[in-house]
């Protein structure tokens, strides 16, 4: 061990943090690490977790949007049911609907190369696709969509996420590299 190096004590869950009001909203491109970070946050802090894809898209129908009123009803139900939560997604218009209730906004922005690599290594998502083969069939489309993040317009674009983040007055952080502690 190097001179002056410190060994960190094992982490324990702080009662203050354990019971704190945590309402974390995570936004970013596909492959930016939103789901991974949300899962870790939920486990570390005992939070309910909502993946926006689960309410925005028709189950097992790739890129078929549900009616906006159904999405809003499901989001409102989640917010009313859970005091402590983490919500993640790239759907900026839906993120806007939950923004008033969050205690922290996290913008995961690691760059296109990281997002592409993460999407290429993504395991099968049975809640989205009927099979790994079906998921792999859609991969070229997803990779193309990820590459367009910084140039496209609309609520799933970098420009929208950047504006949302910059305009938010509450606690927020942008992560551009590395991993983030839950």
Regions found by a protein language model. Give the residues of each.
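Glycine-rich phosphate-binding loop used to anchor ATP phosphates in small-molecule kinases
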Residues: 71-113
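A glycine- and Lys/Arg-enriched "phosphate-lid" helix/loop adjacent to the NTP-binding pocket
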Residues: 110-156
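Conserved substrate/cofactor phosphate-moiety recognition/catalytic segment
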Residues: 39, 43-83
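NTP-dependent small-molecule kinase module
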Residues: 19, 148-182
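Short, structured coil segments at secondary-structure junctions
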Residues: 45, 101-102, 168
